[in-house]
A protein has these predicted regions:
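Acidic, metal/ion-coordinating pockets
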Residues: 26-396
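N-terminal Lys/Arg-rich, disordered targeting/topogenic segments
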Residues: 1-26
Length: 396
């Protein structure tokens, strides 16, 4: 046997032994490759489904905003020749609360409203119900509310006299000194109870009432007083906004009392009704008054600021209204929509910057584009909030 043949057989033997030794390794590599390929495919599928989910949520919010007020906004076509200086832009938020956690861990308070300042300040009038006081650090909270763009607040609520009439008077004076107008503190005459806001040649009357809880100091809803106030408003303004503190807490259902009071207000000249107190969102609608003009009712916009551990209470609406003023000074409801927002609590482990109000539509869009401005947990809360809005606004 030649030396070359012997060497060849030796190499074949070594090669077979190499294959045998590495057989398990090869199988492992193949398995790993299969896992990697499957993972990539699964991730791609999840990403596609996630993108579809985000798109659906964006579309659903847009659908809510466009479907609700078709009857009111249909009149836009007849006003195509309007000029921007003939429109008064009004925004409204719900109850402005400053609970213990928000007071202690929400500082600096300005950071809560970062996403909303431009939206709220780009209006002629921004309304809300100021359901807290200005003691201790709450005075800084009041300043941040003003900085956020809110310039007109109702003091007619069930907690107005929790700390006595002196505290109510101090709150009223402090807010006025900040540059925020107030309404709802009890006065003897309609002339003093009804506040008039003037803009672009129009006068807008602002009225505010709360339900009777056995305390005085603010305007308690009473048909005789309300009728007199609206009569004064109709004689001295072009348009009337009534802020109501009513309804059942934590209920998205409209009570019979709310329906009855809303009908009474519209029949006596109210053009817009803005509701608060339930701490959750309730439905909204556009109805015709006796003259066939559109009137808006927002039964509850929810809590603008709160620290309740309740997802439904963290959901809130910013109402956006446009009032058209013609050359003769007549004012009519021109357009209505809303911005859904959500109050986020970033966790009990934080001692500051714990709370923030998010623009739901913007955050859902950002999440879909890969901008990690919110966590998956917060995103899922926003999705659940969209579901809640859908059940309240579309299906009722």
């Amino acid at each position: 046997m030649s030396r070359r043949s012997s060497r060849g057989r030796g190499r074949n033997k070594e090669f077979k032994e190499f294959l045998k030794k590495n057989k398990k390794m090869n199988i492992t590599i193949i398995v790993l490759l299969v896992i990697i390929i499957c993972s990539i495919a699964t991730y791609s599928l999840i990403k596609i489904n996630q993108d579809r989910k985000v798109a659906i949520e964006k579309d659903r919010i847009s659908m809510q905003q466009s479907d609700i007020f078709k009857s009111a906004n249909a009149e836009l076509e007849s006003l195509d020749d309007y000029k921007s200086n003939s429109l008064i832009r009004i925004s409204a938020v719900g109850d402005i609360l400053c609970g213990n956690n928000l007071e202690k861990y929400g500082m600096p308070y300005d950071s809560i409203f970062t996403e909303l300042k431009k939206k709220l300040k780009n209006t002629d009038l921004t309304l809300g119900t100021y359901e807290t006081d200005v003691q201790d650090s709450k005075s800084d909270f009041a300043t941040s509310i003003k900085n956020a763009g809110i310039n007109y607040v109702s003091l007619a609520h069930n907690h107005a006299l929790d700390y006595g009439e002196e505290d109510l008077n101090e709150t009223n004076e402090y807010l006025n000194n900040l540059g925020m107008k107030t309404v709802g503190k009890y006065e003897e005459s309609s002339e003093k109870r009804v506040k008039i806001f003037e803009k672009k040649g129009a006068k807008i009357a602002i009225l505010a009432y709360t339900y009777d809880n056995g305390k005085q100091g603010v305007n308690i809803y009473d048909e005789e007083m309300v009728r007199a106030d609206l009569e004064y408003a109709n004689q001295n303004s072009n348009f009337s906004i009534v802020m109501m503190h009513w309804g059942d807490v934590y209920s998205s259902e409209i009570s019979e009392e709310q329906k009855s009071q809303a009908e009474f207000l519209i029949d006596n000249g109210a053009d817009i009704i803005i509701g608060a107190h339930p701490s959750v969102v309730q439905k909204m609608e556009v109805v015709k008054n006796k003259d066939g003009q559109d009137c808006y009712i927002g039964y509850s916009l929810g809590d603008f600021t709160s620290d309740f551990e309740n997802e439904d209470s963290n959901l809130e609406l910013i109402l956006n209204l446009q009032v058209y003023v013609d050359t003769e000074g007549k004012a009519t409801l021109y357009k209505v929509d809303y911005t859904p927002v959500y109050m986020v609590d970033y966790g009990k482990e934080l001692t500051d910057n714990r709370f923030k109000i998010l623009d739901m539509k913007a955050e859902i869009a950002n999440y879909g584009e890969g901008q990690n401005s919110v966590t998956e947990d917060i995103y899922n809360k926003l999705v659940r909030a969209v579901d809640k809005l859908n059940s309240i606004i579309i299906k009722q």
